[in-house]
Amino acid sequence: MSWFQKLMPRRIRTDAGPRSRSVPEGLWTKCESCQGILYRPDLERNLEVCPKCGAHMRISARQRLRLFLDESCEAVEIGAELQPSDFLRFRDSKRYRDRLNQAQKATGENDALVAMRGAVHQRPVVVCAFEFGFMGGSMGTIVGERFCRAAEEARANDIPLVCFSASGGARMQEALFSLMQMAKTSAAISRLNEARVPYISVLTDPTMGGVSASLATLGDVIIAEPGALIGFAGPRVIEQTVRETLPEGFQRAEFLLDHGAIDMIVDRRDMRDEIASLMGKLGGDVSVAPAPAPAATVDPEPESAEPEAPAEEAGPAGAAGDQAGESQDEGDPRNA
């Protein structure tokens, strides 16, 4: 025992003891754009948009659909029964089957696209959202099939289709079958165009590769979130290929808007209102709200006590009116 411990009263504790309070994990997070420390509940209330710099953070497909669709209207999932399979028995550094299992456990989804039918501001809509956490949101056979089923649901019911893209491109583990989804989804969008059903495409960070070269850039209206990376090959690959320095902000949403590649940039917090407004302009005022009550019946006007003058007594004015009616009938193309 040291001399200091001998001098201290016995009732005074010499150790700190167990910590009575601890900060829960995940209560604070860091913005990768401005490096600011953010309180997680405040960030969630701000729809995962940094309140300091406005950077839009990546969110899951389910979270995006939950923020976008009306809570009052029950959403019905489309193609949830479809399951991916390793039909090619593909293997690189790891078996494709193992990669699927790992991604399913990490995200809780069975593939990289979630499709639902719901409503936005009481307007019916079919919406798709990519899950970037599932193998980089890559497009395989299940993703292509779910998108096509969602497009067919929209076409059959004459309601708009909205797709939130967040993908690295086609899934290489499915080889040509994944590349075929580019043509398959493009054909589904073509059928929507023939039926004059609106298709709104929202590009989020990142939208690259085969997805950007097919369904993501075929919308009637193309929207992007601020700062989203959009393109086919990445900027680093392009610089190594052309051996030139790319312009500042190349392949970002603002750069694409300035060069006419997209129609508008919309903040995530305004996305619901903006898309609902576009749906009203493109698809008419269709609502799933309850039908209004029937209008009150109006009693017919009482018959006039004075009888109408016979046609013979109408005089020249009546004859002129008959001649005008005959000339209008002759000029009407429906009587040709």
Swiss-Prot record:
Keywords: ATP-binding, Cytoplasm, Fatty acid biosynthesis, Fatty acid metabolism, Lipid biosynthesis, Lipid metabolism, Metal-binding, Nucleotide-binding, Transferase, Zinc, Zinc-finger. It is found in: Cytoplasm. Residues 287-336 are annotated as: Disordered. Its EC number is 2.1.3.15. A zinc finger (C4-type) spans 31-53. Residues 27-297 form the CoA carboxyltransferase N-terminal domain. SUPFAM superfamilies: ClpP/crotonase (SSF52096). One of its GO terms (cellular component) is acetate CoA-transferase complex. Pathway: Lipid metabolism; malonyl-CoA biosynthesis; malonyl-CoA from acetyl-CoA: step 1/1. Residues 312-326 have a biased composition (Low complexity). The keyword Transmembrane helix does not apply. GO terms for biological process: fatty acid biosynthetic process; malonyl-CoA biosynthetic process. Transmembrane segments: none annotated. Signal peptide: none annotated. Belongs to the AccD/PCCB family. Component of the acetyl coenzyme A carboxylase (ACC) complex. Biotin carboxylase (BC) catalyzes the carboxylation of biotin on its carrier protein (BCCP) and then the CO(2) group is transferred by the transcarboxylase to acetyl-CoA to form malonyl-CoA. This is Acetyl-coenzyme A carboxylase carboxyl transferase subunit beta. The gene is accD.
